[in-house]
């Protein structure tokens, strides 16, 4: 593994452990050339996924983009980073095990919304507003109506 500080290839793993859900191995490394310490994560990748965008363009699936969009939806919400990482891993596993090498951005959006719906109401509404391209207040009212008819004890509810 190349050192991110000095670009040396002479690095060693000092500590290695699985994450809570055992889907990722966290490795603590040290560069033998400059003593820089850094962390890497190792994940199983079942297949290369290609995303078919709404305009028909095909792009490689980007796990980091998924993480960023969830972090934006969950900004200032009482959800631990570990739960976000667990959710991202579950979404990626679901996508990879679906049997298709190409998957539409709409399908990804729906899967993300399913996971957010069971995690946090506010994040769900935030994500839905961008994903579904809300234009009017009634768009929000429709989603809020859906949420108020459900009762999931794992979810962080909207304030009443």
From Swiss-Prot:
Domain ATP-cone, chain residue ranges per copy: 49-139
Cofactor(s) in the UniProt record: Zn(2+)
Coiled-coil segments: none
GO biological process per UniProt: negative regulation of DNA-templated transcription
Molecular function (Gene Ontology), one example: ATP binding
Zinc finger (unnamed): 3-34
Entry-linked InterPro entries: ATP-cone_dom, NrdR-like_N, RNR_NrdR-like
Cofactor stoichiometry and binding remark: Binds 1 zinc ion.
Keyword annotations from UniProtKB, A to Z: ATP-binding, DNA-binding, Metal-binding, Nucleotide-binding, Repressor, Transcription, Transcription regulation, Zinc, Zinc-finger
Region (Disordered): 1-20
Family annotation (Pfam families): ATP-cone, Zn_ribbon_NrdR
Polar residues: compositionally biased ranges: 1-11
Cysteine pairs bridged by disulfides in the record: none
Family: Belongs to the NrdR family.
Protein role: Negatively regulates transcription of bacterial ribonucleotide reductase nrd genes and operons by binding to NrdR-boxes.
Entry protein name: Transcriptional repressor NrdR
Organism of this sequence: Nitrobacter winogradskyi (strain ATCC 25391 / DSM 10237 / CIP 104748 / NCIMB 11846 / Nb-255)
